[in-house]
Amino acid sequence: MSEPLILGIESSCDETGVGIVRGNDLLANEVASSMEQHVRFGGVVPEVASRAHLEAIVPVLDKAASTAGVDLSELDGIAVTAGPGLAGALVVGLSAAKALASWLNKPLYGVNHLAGHVAVDLLEHGELPMPCGALLVSGGHTSLLWVNDIATDIIEVGSTIDDAAGEAYDKVARVLGLPYPGGPVIDKAAAEGDPTAIRFPRGLTARHDMVKHRFDYSFSGLKTAVSRWVETQQRDGVEFRIADVAASFQEAVADVLTAKAVDMCQEYGLTHFLIGGGVAANSRLRTLLAERMADAGVELRRPRPGLCTDNGAMIAALGVQVVKAGLPASAMDISADSGLPIETVLV
């Protein structure tokens, strides 16, 4: 039996992505980002994102089909992000997928955006031994997952109880007078700084947190600590290096993310682990996680940075797994679900 040929559409936030995948082979991955339109607002504006998706979806779709060199009539199915994400943005991608599936008379698969971040690793490293652990870290989500089967059985073991890691990056960047989005600019600034210059707090790592929040994250306190530290220095007229603050903040984030990931692997006897999501492109996080997983005897899978951010290829990759699992197609009247839980891989 030939490998499924799946087209994936992603529109959960500010990237309009279309990917085409045959099995674990990536044929096309085209992305149009509306990031520049959100910079002056200091964050993603849902209405602006939705309008950008409307303008970009057809050109991106055409480019992906051309790059892949396949006739859309050859597709075995259309996969699309059904959630979680911005409601209006999701509707644009879902509507496009429904129209395409109807026109081509192909099955529609509404899938979970977060599970897509797990599935995308298959495109780079091939089949993933199960069970495995996963850390998904982005602007909207920070979760530790137990993955028994990418298409049917993903369990959230821990998550953030307040801000996601990516949100903290954006807010700290604003405090430091750095532009949006905060992740890349703080990563760049931190490269010139001293990560030991300031000891910022690591949320939910105290002994009393281990009972209820052993595998959960909290970045609100860290964000506040950085803000207050900067305010104090400015009030007292003390000069400081932005690079040192950025590096110290980034070290705190990477430290707690990786420590809990390793703890999860040791607690559940996991020997394979992967990382995904936009913040997974962060250089310090990738390096520290690799070091700590190696010390723990756990094989780490890290997709290249370009596959960590939102894209259509990850949705197509997940669609392939759904088809190979023999799961039924989604109904054509499915709705977008901005709060779709990770446990629901297929809608």
Swiss-Prot record:
Gene3D superfamilies, alphabetized: 3.30.420.40
Catalytic reaction list: L-threonylcarbamoyladenylate + adenosine(37) in tRNA = N(6)-L-threonylcarbamoyladenosine(37) in tRNA + AMP + H(+)
Binding locations of Fe cation: 113, 117, 310
InterPro entries: ATPase_NBD, Gcp-like_dom, KAE1/TsaD, Peptidase_M22_CS, TsaD
GO CC terms of this entry: cytoplasm
Annotated positions binding substrate: 136-140, 170, 183, 187, 282
Predominant cellular place of this UniProt entry's protein: cytoplasm
Example GO BP: tRNA threonylcarbamoyladenosine modification
Domain of life where this protein originates: Bacteria
Cofactor or coenzyme needed: Fe(2+)
One Pfam family per UniProt: TsaD
EC category name: transferase
EC number of this enzyme: 2.3.1.234
Annotated localization: Cytoplasm
Keywords on record: Acyltransferase, Cytoplasm, Iron, Metal-binding, Transferase, tRNA processing
Manner of cofactor binding, per the entry note: Binds 1 Fe(2+) ion per subunit.
SUPFAM superfamilies reported for this sequence: Actin-like ATPase domain (SSF53067)
GO-annotated molecular function: iron ion binding; N(6)-L-threonylcarbamoyladenine synthase activity
Functional note: Required for the formation of a threonylcarbamoyl group on adenosine at position 37 (t(6)A37) in tRNAs that read codons beginning with adenine. Is involved in the transfer of the threonylcarbamoyl moiety of threonylcarbamoyl-AMP (TC-AMP) to the N6 group of A37, together with TsaE and TsaB. TsaD likely plays a direct catalytic role in this reaction.
PANTHER family named in the record: TRNA N6-ADENOSINE THREONYLCARBAMOYLTRANSFERASE, TRNA N6-ADENOSINE THREONYLCARBAMOYLTRANSFERASE, MITOCHONDRIAL
Stated family: Belongs to the KAE1 / TsaD family.
Name this protein carries in UniProt: tRNA N6-adenosine threonylcarbamoyltransferase
